[in-house]
UniProtKB/Swiss-Prot annotation:
This is NADH-quinone oxidoreductase subunit K. Belongs to the complex I subunit 4L family. It comes from Methylobacterium sp. (strain 4-46). The keyword Transmembrane applies. Keywords: Cell inner membrane, Cell membrane, Membrane, NAD, Quinone, Translocase, Transmembrane, Transmembrane helix, Transport, Ubiquinone.
């Protein structure tokens, strides 16, 4: 049977991969957004695992809210990247830092 420790291990691995991906690849904005989504996925796995372990549904409901916010964040982030790419011709992080504002 798959226990709580298995879910926590998978979530810890996903969280670590997301954080390492952000620190290792600082040049591509799309990869950074994907790593943030990976971190949010690890958080959701923890929420659902603890929710089922404790027999409470609040963690699962909160995971749905996190999924909704993550989807909105990804959509807005990609829309901003498309507009930025059309204006600058590049999506490198160095170019984003040079924006006025």
């Amino acid at each position: 049977m798959i226990g709580l420790s298995h879910y926590l291990t998978v979530a810890a691995i996903l969280f670590t991969l997301g954080v390492l991906g952000i620190f290792i690849n600082r040049k591509n904005v799309i990869v950074i957004l994907m790593c943030v989504e990976l971190i949010l996925l690890a958080v959701n796995i923890n929420l659902v695992a603890f929710s089922t372990h404790l027999g409470d549904i609040v963690g699962q409901v909160f995971a749905l809210f996190v999924l909704t916010v993550a989807a909105a964040e990804a959509a807005i982030g990609l829309a901003i990247l498309v507009v930025f790419f059309r204006n600058r011709g590049s999506i490198a992080v160095e170019d984003v830092n040079m924006m006025k504002g």
